[in-house]
Curated annotation (Swiss-Prot):
GO terms for biological process: mismatch repair. It comes from Bacillus cereus (strain ZK / E33L). GO terms for molecular function: ATP binding; ATP hydrolysis activity; ATP-dependent DNA damage sensor activity; mismatched DNA binding. PANTHER family: DNA MISMATCH REPAIR PROTEIN MLH, PMS, MUTL, DNA MISMATCH REPAIR PROTEIN MLH1. This is DNA mismatch repair protein MutL. This protein is involved in the repair of mismatches in DNA. It is required for dam-dependent methyl-directed DNA mismatch repair. May act as a 'molecular matchmaker', a protein that promotes the formation of a stable complex between two or more DNA-binding proteins in an ATP-dependent manner without itself being part of a final effector complex. Gene3D superfamilies: 3.30.230.10, Histidine kinase-like ATPase, C-terminal domain, MutL, C-terminal domain, dimerisation subdomain, MutL, C-terminal domain, regulatory subdomain.
C-alpha cells in the first residue's frame, strides 16, 4: 500500500489557516476586505478581548445568496476570478478563496447574511463542521461573528501575545484599511468602547486626522504625480514631524495595503538629507497602476507584491517628493507651550501655523560679544572651507549659569501610533456624530501649506549665543541658526559637486601615504580601484597587501587629507558592493562635517553675515546633510504671546 495519501478538506483547511490566519488581526483583515469587496459603505468591527474571545463584523454590502453560503466556506471557492487570465486583472482585495474556510476551521463562526432580494441565511460552523443552516429575517448585508479563535489549535493559541499587543495589531490593520478606503465608514469597538470612527466621506486627510491627530494633519504635504504607467497620490509630513519607526508609512497599491520595503525606501529617498538618521516620516501613498504591472499572488496573506516596472515607480516617487519639498519653506516653528484647560490645546500650540501681520523690515544693529573686533578678521570663506577663524585669546565666556547640555533637536510632538489604543467612554451615537462633525470642521479649516518656493528669506543678524547659535530677525519674527549645521550644508553642496567628477588639479604629497590592509580588505579594495578614481582617489599597489597614495584632489580639506582617505577606504571595505553614488554622498557628508565651524567658536559681524548670505544660495538651506534642522523660527505673534502682549 502506498504511503502518500490525499488529505481531507478539514485537515487541509487547518494547514492553510497556518498561513492565512496567524492572529486575530489576520481575521479582521480578511473579513473587512471581504466587506469592502462586497461594495459596503459602512463597516462595524466589534472586538472582545482583542479578538481572541470574539470578533464581529457588520456591513451593509451586497450580502451572500443562500445557494452560495455553503460554497463560500469550501477551499478555493471565490466569486472574484474565473480563469488564469483574471489573475492578471485583479482589482478586488480577495481572490484566493482561502480566508473563510481557514477562519471557520479554527473557530466557532456564525454568519447572518442577505442580498436584500430574498430571506437571509443563518449559518453556524464549528471547527470547519456545519452545525446549523436556516433561513432568517435579515437586512441587506452581512453580519459575521468569530468566537473562540484557535480553540482547536492550542499550540497557536499559546503563542498569542498580550491583549494590548494583539489589539495594537488589529488597530494597525484597521487604520491602514481606513486610509486606503476613505470612502468607507469604519467603526472599531473594543469591549464596547469606541477606538475609531471615520466618516466615509472620501477625505483622506480627515482619516489621517482621526488616526494621527489634527496636529499631524496640519503638517501634511499633499503629493500627486502621474506617468504613463503610474498615478500616485497621498500625504507626507513635513520633515519636522518624524517617528522612530517606518511603521508610520503606509503604501497602498490599487486600493490594497502592502508591505514593501523598496517603496518605503523610495519615500525616504524623497526626503534626502531632510531627516536625521533613525527618524522616519508619517506618510500615506496611494499608487494606481494597471493590474498587469503588479503581482499580488505572492503570499496567501496578500501583503507582499512584486512590480514589473519597479525602478520607474521608485524614481517617480523620489522625484515627486523632492519636487514638493523644493516648493516649501521648511523652517520649523518653535511653538509656544502653555498650560490649557483643554488637554489637547498645549499640543496643538506646538504645531499651529501662525500668521503675523507683516511689518516693514529694518536692518537691526549687530550686537557682538565683548572683545571681538570685526575689522581684524576677513569674512568667513564658506566657498573654500579650509581656514576657519579662531577666536581671540580674551574671548567672551557666558556665565556658568547659562551653560546647558547640548541636546539634539527633536520636534515637540507626542507619538501618535506608538500608543495606538485610545480607550474612550462607552459609545454614544450623539456624542460620536458631534465628534465627527467637529473633526470635519477642523480638517476643512486646515490651511494648505504654502508651496510658493523654498528660498530662504533675508535674515538680519542680531548676535551669537554660546559661540554656537546665531540669532537673526526679519519681518516674520526671530530665527535661531545652528552655525555648524549651516556651514555643513554649504560645504556639503560644495563637496558634492567636487566629488562628483574626476579632479583636474591634484596636490602631490611630499611623502606618499601608505595604507596597510588585511588580505580580504586588500582584495576588496583592488576590485574597486576604478570606482575610487571617480571620487578622486588614485591608489597604487605597494607590496603584498598595501597601497600608496601619491596625490589627492586640491579640494580635500587642508590638514585632514589622510583622515579623509582612511575614512573613504573604510567605506569601501565595509560595503560588499561599492555603490558609487552612495560613496560620493558619504564622502561629501564626511568632508563637509570636518571642514565646518564647530560649537563654541565665536564669529565676527562680517563672518555671520557672510554665512547667512551663503546659506541662502544653497538648494536646501533648512537641514544639514545629516537631516538636522539648521534654523528654527519664532513668529512675532508667538513672541508677543509669550510676553502676554496678546492673549
Amino acid at each position: 500500500m502506498g504511503k502518500i495519501r490525499k488529505l481531507d478538506d478539514q485537515l487541509s483547511n487547518l494547514i492553510a489557516a497556518g498561513e492565512v490566519v496567524e492572529r486575530p488581526a489576520s481575521v479582521v483583515k480578511e473579513l473587512v476586505e471581504n466587506s469592502i469587496d462586497a461594495n459596503s459603505t459602512s463597516i462595524e468591527i466589534h472586538l472582545e478581548e482583542a479578538g481572541l474571545s470574539k470578533i464581529r463584523i457588520i456591513d451593509n454590502g451586497d450580502g451572500i445568496a443562500e445557494e452560495d453560503c455553503i460554497v463560500a466556506f469550501e477551499r478555493h471557492a471565490t466569486s472574484k476570478i474565473k480563469d488564469e487570465n483574471d489573475l492578471f486583472r485583479i482589482r478586488t482585495l480577495g481572490f484566493r478563496g482561502e480566508a473563510l474556510p481557514s477562519i471557520a476551521s479554527v473557530s466557532e463562526l456564525e454568519l447572518i447574511t442577505s442580498t436584500g432580494d430574498a430571506p437571509g441565511t443563518h449559518l453556524i460552523i464549528k471547527g470547519g463542521d456545519i452545525i446549523k443552516q436556516e433561513k432568517t429575517a435579515s437586512r441587506k448585508g452581512t453580519d459575521i461573528t468569530v468566537q473562540n479563535l484557535f480553540f482547536n489549535t492550542p499550540a497557536r493559541l499559546k503563542y498569542m501575545k498580550t491583549i494590548h499587543t494583539e489589539l495594537g495589531n488589529i488597530t494597525d490593520i484597521v487604520y491602514r484599511i481606513a486610509m486606503s478606503h476613505p470612502e468607507v465608514s469604519l467603526k472599531l469597538f473594543h469591549n464596547e468602547k469606541k477606538l475609531l470612527h471615520t466618516s466615509g466621506n472620501g477625505d483622506v486627510r480627515q482619516v489621517l486626522a482621526s488616526i494621527y491627530s489634527i496636529q499631524v494633519a496640519k503638517k501634511l504635504v499633499p503629493i500627486e504625480a502621474e506617468s504613463l504607467d503610474f498615478t500616485i497620490k497621498g500625504y507626507v509630513t513635513l520633515p519636522e514631524v518624524t517617528r522612530a519607526s517606518r511603521n508610520y508609512m503606509s503604501t497602498i497599491v490599487n486600493g490594497r495595503y502592502v508591505r514593501n520595503f523598496v517603496l518605503m525606501k523610495a519615500i525616504q529617498q524623497g526626503y534626502h538629507t531632510l531627516l536625521p538618521v533613525g527618524r522616519y516620516p508619517i506618510g500615506f501613498l496611494s499608487i494606481e497602476m494597471d493590474p498587469m504591472l503588479v503581482d499580488v499572488n505572492v503570499h496567501p496573506a496578500k501583503l507582499e507584491v512584486r512590480f514589473s516596472k519597479e525602478q520607474e515607480l521608485l524614481k517617480l516617487i523620489e522625484e515627486t517628493l523632492q519636487a514638493a519639498f523644493k516648493k516649501i519653506q521648511l523652517i520649523p516653528d518653535a511653538g509656544v507651550t502653555t498650560k490649557k484647560k483643554e488637554k489637547d490645546e498645549s499640543v496643538q500650540e506646538q504645531f499651529q501655523f501662525e500668521h503675523a501681520k507683516p511689518k516693514e523690515p529694518s536692518m537691526p544693529e549687530i550686537v557682538l560679544p565683548t572683545g571681538m573686533d570685526e575689522k581684524q578678521e576677513e569674512p568667513l570663506a564658506v566657498k573654500q572651507p579650509a581656514q576657519l577663524w579662531q577666536p581671540p585669546k580674551q574671548e567672551w565666556q557666558p556665565p556658568q549659569s547659562l551653560v546647558r547640555e547640548e541636546q539634539s533637536w527633536q520636534p515637540s510632538t507626542k507619538p501618535i501610533m506608538e500608543e495606538p489604543i485610545r480607550e474612550e467612554k462607552s459609545w454614544n451615537s450623539n456624542d460620536e456624530d458631534f465628534e465627527l462633525e467637529e473633526l470635519e470642521e477642523e480638517v476643512q479649516e486646515i490651511e494648505e501649506i504654502e508651496m510658493n518656493g523654498n528660498d530662504l528669506p533675508p535674515l538680519y543678524p542680531i548676535g551669537q549665543m554660546h559661540g554656537t547659535y546665531i540669532f537673526a530677525q526679519n519681518d516674520k519674527g526671530l530665527y535661531m541658526i545652528d552655525q555648524h549645521a549651516a556651514q555643513e550644508r554649504i560645504n556639503y553642496e560644495y563637496f558634492r559637486d567636487k566629488v562628483g567628477r574626476v579632479a583636474q588639479e591634484v596636490q602631490e604629497l611630499l611623502v606618499p601615504y601608505r595604507i596597510d590592509l588585511s588580505l580580504t580588505e586588500f582584495l576588496r579594495v583592488e576590485e574597486q580601484l576604478e570606482e575610487l578614481k571617480k571620487v578622486g582617489l588614485f591608489l597604487e599597489q605597494f607590496g603584498h597587501q598595501s597601497f600608496i597614495v601619491r596625490s589627492h584632489p586640491t579640494w580635500f580639506p587642508k590638514g585632514q587629507e589622510t583622515e579623509i582617505i582612511d575614512e573613504m577606504m573604510e567605506q569601501v571595505v565595509k560595503l560588499k558592493k561599492v555603490d558609487i553614488k552612495k560613496l560620493r554622498e558619504e564622502a561629501a557628508i564626511m568632508m563637509s562635517c570636518k571642514a565646518s565651524i564647530k560649537a563654541n567658536q565665536y564669529l565676527t559681524n562680517d563672518q555671520i553675515f557672510a554665512l547667512l548670505e551663503e546659506l541662502r544660495t544653497t538648494t536646501n538651506p533648512y537641514t544639514c546633510p545629516h537631516g538636522r534642522p539648521i534654523l528654527v523660527h519664532h513668529s512675532t505673534y508667538e513672541l508677543e504671546k509669550m510676553f502676554k502682549r496678546v492673549m
